[in-house]
């Protein structure tokens, strides 16, 4: 079962989801994660409903999910260091006493992988865990932007310090390698 959107949450109809190697690591038990859980973190979909405080998106908007969600108002976020958000573990999840976003029919909570769980027909996520995209962008391609594309691009630009016009060799031609 999936809950109703809280004040800063968005309900999304999943249109496409990529299978990342990170998902495979969790499925194989190489990375610990509490079960039951719904995996998946590369996804695109269409907004179905929004919480009372959400103003960035509205029903019908096309969106991609972001695994690097942030609160938007702590000192790290306001200083432009979104990946260092001080409130990731508190504000982006439901609090004790609140109904879970995902649950089994008996009410048992189901954990959300990276606060997303895109291997489901619908996702209920924090508003800061998505980005609105142009309606003309194919959702089956857009879903790869949230992890593989930004990981490959970030590896080339930030880790390898590659600049326009330079020649590089990329070893591997998966989604990340092709995006580097």
State the predicted function of each range.
Residues 121, 128-130, 134-180:
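Mid-domain Rossmann-like dinucleotide-binding core that forms the NAD(H)/NADP(H) cofactor-binding site
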Residues 67-128:
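Cysteine-cluster motifs in flexible loop/terminal segments that predominantly coordinate metals
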Residues 1-17, 27-78, 83, 132-136:
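Glycine-rich beta-strand-centered segment in the early N-terminal region that forms part
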Residues 38, 42, 114, 118, ...:
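Conserved active-site and cofactor/substrate-binding residues in soluble primary-metabolism enzymes
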Residues 59, 109-111, 139-143:
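Flexible, glycine/proline-enriched loop segments at strand-loop-helix junctions
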